[in-house]
């Protein structure tokens, strides 16, 4: 069993690492899927450094203020859905960038996939979550 894990484990994690890297590179996307405040994101050098994380923290402060104000306004269901979608894109992309920064600063860390099932009253939603691990610790920067 150890031989199997030693040979195939890096192959399995390689895809999760590639997926997270791709998602982290979506931070300054400039199309209809761009995040809010794209000019602010463009001003940040996204080089997976600790300095870039500090600047992203300023971005997240602007985002929190924006969503706090947006939630104080009356909304139709479509507007609310749009806000949730935007918030989800921000959490996933910034979380992936945070995880990639950790991974690039310390090569012991890798992404792994965790399959989850969420039970609702009428359905079971199956999803895969990327989790960062150094084989002793786990963290979920995208949640």
Which positions does each model-derived feature cover?
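N-terminal low-complexity, intrinsically disordered segments
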Residues: 1-90
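Aromatic- and glycine-enriched beta-alpha-beta binding-site module
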Residues: 86-124
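A recognition module on extended beta-rich or small alphabeta surfaces enriched in W/G with H and D/E
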Residues: 41, 120-143
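Intrinsically disordered, low-complexity coil segments
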Residues: 68-83, 107, 117-123, 135-138
